[in-house]
């Protein structure tokens, strides 16, 4: 099998597929509150295009798929997309990242269709604050979604918490306490300067050492763990006696580019080899032309930088006062 390897020796076996740029929330670090323009439906990859693309990609070693958005559960055919991917025997793992507003309704059907596990965005455990950060989200719907995911067996369940200075950094111990009784993985993620978030990044960024300081102040003893399926770049720990775990993902302060094994496919059919790099290849016209398609995929991988050089990119954007990246919901979270 010919593997998808870049010039630095990194083998790519994992792809994140955005199935929509639309979302029912407007999280402060992801999207502006108004003035958004979304892709017309005909510009978005269809179920058949996504499945055809993946039937080719598995021949080159891709074996893990994460479905993202936007909010992927807004797709009326999301269960059929999962079922189509689940019918490809070479795919070992199918996961989804969701805000969980509709997860309680769809979790069982998704599990039956072949979904392996779920990541849920949850940035506050306080109703009013959660509503403010998401600009309209309902915390109870997320909690109901978590419960339903547990009931149907979508394990491991991971909760993604973007740490935002002055907005939810006083809830760290609340989230840590959440792991004591629930078999879930809380993942604290550094605030990233992407698209809409780029202009306010420095004001809201907190290094993830803050997590360990909170542990120590609360008197929590913790130890590293490394047995969580699909843990990716997360460094994981368990508080003594807890059922669940917590992890830290620090793409800003300690990037993990040297072990990056992932590609991204945007909802409109562009391959990106690096989340923080502008270069992308439009593969949609060639989904039925496997030779040309794989040439473009390999070209994207060949051009992948050794690391994302985020600091340099930020400096350029601050000077021009104009972020050049797509917003996160356009790339796929």
Swiss-Prot record:
InterPro entries: Aldolase_TIM, Elp3/MiaA/NifB-like_rSAM, MoaA, MoaA_NifB_PqqE_Fe-S-bd_CS, MoaA_twitch, MoCo_biosynth_MoaA/MoaC, rSAM. GO terms for biological process: Mo-molybdopterin cofactor biosynthetic process. Residues 7-221 form the Radical SAM core domain. Binds 2 [4Fe-4S] clusters. Binds 1 [4Fe-4S] cluster coordinated with 3 cysteines and an exchangeable S-adenosyl-L-methionine and 1 [4Fe-4S] cluster coordinated with 3 cysteines and the GTP-derived substrate. S-adenosyl-L-methionine binds at residues 29, 70, 121, 192. It catalyses: GTP + AH2 + S-adenosyl-L-methionine = (8S)-3',8-cyclo-7,8-dihydroguanosine 5'-triphosphate + 5'-deoxyadenosine + L-methionine + A + H(+). Transmembrane segments: none annotated. GO terms for molecular function: 4 iron, 4 sulfur cluster binding; cyclic pyranopterin monophosphate synthase activity; GTP 3',8'-cyclase activity; GTP binding; metal ion binding; S-adenosyl-L-methionine binding. [4Fe-4S] cluster 1 binds at residues 23, 27, 30. Its cofactor is [4Fe-4S] cluster. Its EC number is 4.1.99.22. Pathway: Cofactor biosynthesis; molybdopterin biosynthesis. Keywords: 4Fe-4S, GTP-binding, Iron, Iron-sulfur, Lyase, Metal-binding, Molybdenum cofactor biosynthesis, Nucleotide-binding, S-adenosyl-L-methionine. GTP binds at residues 16, 66, 97, 158, 262-264. [4Fe-4S] cluster 2 binds at residues 257, 260, 274. Catalyzes the cyclization of GTP to (8S)-3',8-cyclo-7,8-dihydroguanosine 5'-triphosphate. Belongs to the radical SAM superfamily. MoaA family. Monomer and homodimer. HAMAP family: MoaA_B. This is GTP 3',8-cyclase. It comes from Listeria monocytogenes serotype 4b (strain F2365). The gene is moaA.
């Amino acid at each position: 099998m010919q593997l998808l390897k870049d010039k630095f020796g990194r083998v790519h076996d994992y792809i994140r597929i955005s199935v929509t740029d639309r979302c029912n929330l407007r999280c402060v670090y992801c999207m502006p509150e108004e003035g958004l323009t979304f892709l017309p439906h005909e510009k978005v990859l269809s179920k058949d295009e996504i499945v055809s693309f993946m039937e080719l990609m598995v021949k080159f070693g891709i074996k893990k798929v994460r479905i993202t958005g936007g909010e992927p559960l807004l797709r009326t055919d999301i269960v059929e997309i999962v079922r189509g991917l689940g019918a490809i025997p070479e795919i070992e793992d199918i996961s989804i990242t969701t805000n969980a507003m509709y997860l309680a309704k769809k979790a069982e059907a998704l599990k039956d269709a072949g979904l392996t596990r779920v990541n849920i965005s949850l940035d506050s455990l306080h109703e009013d604050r959660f509503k403010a950060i998401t600009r309209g989200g309902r915390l109870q719907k997320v909690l109901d979604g978590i419960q339903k995911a547990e009931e149907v067996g979508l394990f491991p369940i991971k909760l993604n918490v973007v740490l935002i200075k002055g907005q939810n950094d006083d809830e760290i111990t609340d989230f840590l306490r959440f792991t004591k009784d629930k078999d879930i993985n809380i993942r604290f993620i550094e605030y990233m300067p992407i698209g809409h978030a780029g202009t306010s990044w420095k004001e809201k960024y907190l290094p993830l050492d803050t997590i360990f300081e909170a542990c120590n102040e609360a008197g929590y003893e913790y130890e590293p763990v490394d047995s969580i399926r699909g843990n990716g770049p997360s460094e994981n720990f368990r508080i003594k006696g807890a059922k669940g775990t917590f992890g830290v993902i620090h793409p800003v302060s300690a990037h993990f580019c040297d072990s990056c094994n992932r590609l991204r496919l945007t909802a409109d059919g562009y391959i990106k080899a690096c989340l923080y790099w502008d270069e992308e290849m439009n593969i949609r016209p060639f989904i039925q032309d496997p030779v040309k398609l794989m040439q473009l995929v390999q070209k994207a991988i060949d051009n992948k930088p050794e690391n994302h050089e985020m600091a340099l990119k930020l400096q350029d954007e601050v000077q021009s006062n104009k972020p050049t990246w797509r917003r996160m919901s356009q790339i796929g979270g």
